[in-house]
């Protein structure tokens, strides 16, 4: 699937909760879970488009979940149905779902849930448990239960699910594969837990990006084989290859 640049119309742009929005575009898009698009709704400022993960896709539309964290995403959050938006993608390697089988744990935190919901939807032949951690109750995983065997929530304030961190009750030895996305400190812990139990883990890296096509090297990640670009060789990497910060 080759990336392409197109000008589309916003179908809907819904506020999911404080600071979190879901933007949808009508059309049929050939995408893989874990891939992303560059979104842009301005001409000059800010300079860069914004890399946003695919939250859902079907025969009718594609949806993106994003957090408002700066000028670019603030502009995106103000878009209305019918407004123009420029998109480039799909970008990145994504998850190869055909190679994942058996009992699977998806472990994610914060806005890192965005690519993992669409991943869960596509793991049709797997037995999936979905671990999601937040600071407080979140609506971003409201639709994931229909895709998984069990949804296991954790919140730091105890507003829903386990009070604490998403890794507290996670036992990697119970799974054939672990798939993870979220804050780097969380991913570091998940990788270490999986290494101790000899369970393969795939990590979807969240990195700042500029060009999205591998030219600028802004999004490089440290790996045991040297630096790799999250936008080209990633964002999905085998956890044992990465050098993460704890």
From Swiss-Prot:
Protein family membership: Belongs to the PyrK family.
Domain of life of the organism encoding this protein: Bacteria
Cofactor note: Binds 1 [2Fe-2S] cluster per subunit.
Gene Ontology molecular function terms on file: 2 iron, 2 sulfur cluster binding; electron transfer activity; flavin adenine dinucleotide binding; metal ion binding; oxidoreductase activity
Biological role stated in the UniProt entry: Responsible for channeling the electrons from the oxidation of dihydroorotate from the FMN redox center in the PyrD type B subunit to the ultimate electron acceptor NAD(+).
Entries under Pfam families matching the protein: DHODB_Fe-S_bind
Annotated FAD binding sites: 50-53, 72-73
Cofactor(s) recorded in Swiss-Prot or TrEMBL: [2Fe-2S] cluster; FAD
Pathway the protein contributes to: Pyrimidine metabolism; UMP biosynthesis via de novo pathway; orotate from (S)-dihydroorotate (NAD(+) route): step 1/1
Disulfide bridges in this chain: none
Annotated CDD domains: DHOD_e_trans
Gene3D superfamilies according to UniProt: Dihydroorotate dehydrogenase, electron transfer subunit, Nucleotide-binding domain of ferredoxin-NADP reductase (FNR) module, Translation factors
Keywords of this entry: 2Fe-2S, Electron transport, FAD, Flavoprotein, Iron, Iron-sulfur, Metal-binding, Pyrimidine biosynthesis, Transport
Highest classification ranks of the organism: Bacteria, Bacillati, Bacillota, Clostridia, Eubacteriales
Limits of the FAD-binding FR-type domain: 3-97
Coiled-coil residues: none
Residues annotated for [2Fe-2S] cluster binding in this entry: 211, 216, 219, 231
Quaternary structure annotation from Swiss-Prot or TrEMBL: Heterotetramer of 2 PyrK and 2 PyrD type B subunits.
Gene Ontology process terms (BP): 'de novo' UMP biosynthetic process
HAMAP family for the chain: DHODB_Fe_S_bind
InterPro entries in UniProt: Cyt_c3_hydrogenase_gsu, Dihydroorotate_DH_ele_sf, Dihydroorotate_DH_Fe-S-bd, Dihydroorotate_DHASE_ETsu, FAD-bd_FR_type, FNR_nucleotide-bd, PyrK_electron_transfer, Riboflavin_synthase-like_b-brl
The protein's name: Dihydroorotate dehydrogenase B (NAD(+)), electron transfer subunit
